[in-house]
Amino acid sequence: MKARRGEEVMNQTIYAYISDGGIQEEISQGAGRIAGTLGLDNLIMFYDANNVQLSTKVEDVDAENVAMKYEAWGWKVIQINGNDVNEIRKALKEAKAEISKPTLIIGNTVMGKGAVGADNSCYENKVSTHGQPLSAAGASIADTIKNLGGDPEHPFTIFPEVAELYAKRAKELEVIVAERYAVKDVWAKAHPDLAAKMEQWFSGKAPQIDWAAIEQKANQATRAASATVLGVLATHVENMIVASADLSNSDKTDGFLKKTHAFVKGDFSGAFFQAGVAELSMACICIGMSLHGGVIAACGTFFVFSDYMKPALRMAALMEQPVKFIWTHDAFRVGEDGPTHEPVEQEAQVRLLEKLKNHKGHNSMLVLRPADVVETTVAWKLAMENVYTPTALILSRQNITDLPAKENRYQEALQAEKGAYIVNEDANADVILLASGSEVSTLVEGAALLRAEGIKVRIVSVPSEGLFRSQSKEYQESILPAGSRIFGLTAGLPVNLEGLVGPNGKVWGLESFGFSAPYKVLDEKLGFTAKNVYNQVKELLA
């Protein structure tokens, strides 16, 4: 933001706080490495190092030298007595003066400072006081208050010198804030166009894109179609940042990268964030950017690696942050990489967040698995217009045959905005064929075999069950009438579609891990062919 709008209006310092437990969390390793590598000099982190955690002393589980670790990552490290306010002030001034790297202030503190028992025994630095009230640990709250110079009869009385200090600081801050706003107003008058853009960015409103004008190459993988859209967004959405966990050329976020350049230390004029192999850290950093405001954040990796991101997905959903998650290589068709890289259960896991409501009563996440290149454009339209919750786009590695269109494929694909729609149909259909993603084109091929025998078919694409379930009962009934015979095809667990096919239906899906083989071989072996669709539907209708 500073690189785009200047230091006059974007000169914040970001303060972070971390504990002994936080230092041990995996995400602190990724975030620490990235912040140091990029030289984020406006980041100051306080580390409360008291050597006590919930179940043990820190030394029992962690022997690392934290200062050396952060210095190795490129941080400035300041060590102080964390219980001394003068040392804290001095460290803050030093950290604020740093202009080339983030700063870690290690405050060596005393856990439960001043805590005593009724017999005046010391309760400082005890594991027992970490996760429970002092009294439950055996200390005396009244005697502790006395020991700290307070009055047990009036424990919440603010000392006069403290009240005076805070009142003085409040007045100082009022002046500082007024000065900041004055500078911002002068800047806005001098740069009205930039100020208008800034207001738009922080409004949280979706950017205006001519989605119908996006031209897609026919019969491509949906990851390639996503790259096409990202290329447009890179040139039309100035406040968008896209990240990848060392897979930009595979997850095709390079469609965005090719129109900009990656962040590097000292140059943040680009809009691409190379996170390295750190899916969880990447996702959390994107959430942080979203929480800051003014930024549209998106990040990409293989779908199977969404497993590493689950805590971040939950937090994005809980905090209602509209981060865009781009997951490619969506099924067993990853092929030769084998079962370690072939997602099976991941779609079912992620779609649970479509069923979970946030505190505003909305689906906590929008999950989209488009069926062809044009539906991918529409999926991105939905993602960018969703400014209320996170969005997931689940995309194919392999090419997909475009779905048939009566007239204008884009206009027909816009029906995906309701979560499910009819791709094509025969009057008085005998069976409904249902799928998302690349399986829809397989249904189209299977339908041709069924129609050759006089079986009437309706084909339905369901990129988002959660979105479909949010439509009126009338619309849902118009797509999937009650009592219909429905066949579902999914490259994930059958549970992905079982709620849609109902008691008169049947789902063909995977109930085991994948295998290492070319994807066309796996299609045959695992039954994802037109012939098997024909066989399964004939059996259903028998």
Residue spans for each PLM region:
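Short, glycine/acidic-enriched loop or turn micro-motifs at the edges of active sites
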Residues: 22-23, 51, 111, 249, ...
